[in-house]
């Protein structure tokens, strides 16, 4: 997504070698618009990508400092802690026991999704004592997944697989969770 100063940016298609891009405006204007109309735009976007990578389109030079995250904001951010060893270590670091059920029933929380950082922007923190921690994670973007969808059927709902940097303020987490209402400031 090209950071054009708007809240949702402008969808672009980047070449596989990360050297060139074209705007997708003739098909859709934003990544969210692409998700909302996936069945009708997926093939069109794929065709543009094929032509771009074959050198058949007039393109612009890609500069990673000019892009935003694919979704500058989104409707939902649900983070599942599927790496149980990591959950165990993080809980141990803050003096919390890990329930046995986490081995079979993964921990999940709903995080903020109203303002994601661009990939090349600095992460500014007013006070380092808050304990900034960054985790490389895998993000799965889906279409609509109705309640009761089977695991097998859920696979067909996957639209994108992305890498994401999840930022936590580890030293704020214990006091925040002690309030019994979950993450707000620390994630």
Task: Set out the residue ranges of the language-model regions.
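Glycine-enriched loop-and-adjacent helix/strand subsegments that border the catalytic/binding cleft
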Residues: 74-187
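N-terminal non-catalytic cap/leader segment that marks the start of a structured domain
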Residues: 1-107, 112-113, 129
